[in-house]
Curated annotation (Swiss-Prot):
InterPro entries: NqrDE/RnfAE, RnfE. The lineage of its organism: Bacteria, Pseudomonadati, Pseudomonadota, Gammaproteobacteria, Vibrionales. It comes from Aliivibrio fischeri (strain ATCC 700601 / ES114). This is Ion-translocating oxidoreductase complex subunit E. Part of a membrane-bound complex that couples electron transfer with translocation of ions across the membrane. GO terms for biological process: electron transport chain. It is found in: Cell inner membrane.
Length: 227
């Protein structure tokens, strides 16, 4: 069973679902035009990931191996429906903004992948922690990409935060610089592709520098034996 430290490291960095596994790219590219949209979808994904991992782990012994995938999809779809109804009730503006990408969480490969590869093979607590940190890793990338695109495209940060957090959150809006016309490349999917590529490249550079700092093991000297 993986330790909590390993789960945190895997979810946030070593096996990040967006930057390493390259899963969930459809919502990542489509919804991350602003920090608010990115954070809203990230929270919804975390809730579904944690819930599906917990339920799959609890019932894994009673699910026949032959039908496990359809059962996992039904569990995930039920949780997504609950999250969709909650968002419709308490964050209606964000619900309209995210649109079809909320129900499309059902088809997100991150969620079904964690249910199949981890939750179905581990106890409830590790499964919940795995879902939490994988979701946090995905949300972190969503928010970073959303911040990059919103700053470059609109010159703002946390625009529309009231859609997620309520009327008080209008004070969170920051205008970094004024733009007469939006930078469309940053706001459209091509800009999202470029942003994801930049984040992946940055992660690879950091990984390489960290690897270079590690002391390298000396190769063992093989001696020929003559008899």
């Amino acid at each position: 069973m993986a330790s909590h430290k390993e789960l945190v490291k895997n979810g946030l960095w070593d096996n990040n679902p967006a930057l390493v596994q390259l899963l969930g790219l459809c919502p990542l590219l489509a919804v991350s035009a602003t920090v608010t949209n990115a954070l809203g979808l990230g929270i919804a994904t975390i809730l579904v990931l944690v819930g599906s991992n917990l339920i799959v782990s609890l019932v894994r012994q009673w699910i026949p191996q032959e039908v496990r995938i359809p059962v996992f999809v039904m569990i995930i779809a039920s949780l997504v429906t609950c999250v969709q109804l909650l968002m419709n009730a308490y964050a209606y503006g964000l619900y309209l903004s995210l649109g079809i990408f909320i129900p499309l969480i059902v088809t997100n490969c991150i969620i079904i992948g964690r249910a199949e590869s981890f939750a179905s093979k581990n106890d409830p607590l590790p499964a919940v922690l795995d879902g939490l940190w994988m979701g946090m890793g995905m949300t972190a990338v969503l928010v970073l990409l959303g911040a990059m695109r919103e700053i470059l495209g609109n010159g703002t940060l946390f625009d529309g935060a009231d859609l997620l957090l309520g009327d008080w959150a209008t004070m969170l809006r920051i205008e970094l610089f004024h733009v007469d016309s939006h930078f469309l490349l940053a706001m459209l999917p091509p800009g999202a592709f470029l942003g994801v590529g930049f984040l992946i490249a940055l992660k690879n550079v950091i990984d390489k520098k960290m690897a270079d700092r590690q002391p390298k093991e000396k190769a063992e000297i093989e001696r020929a034996r003559i008899s």
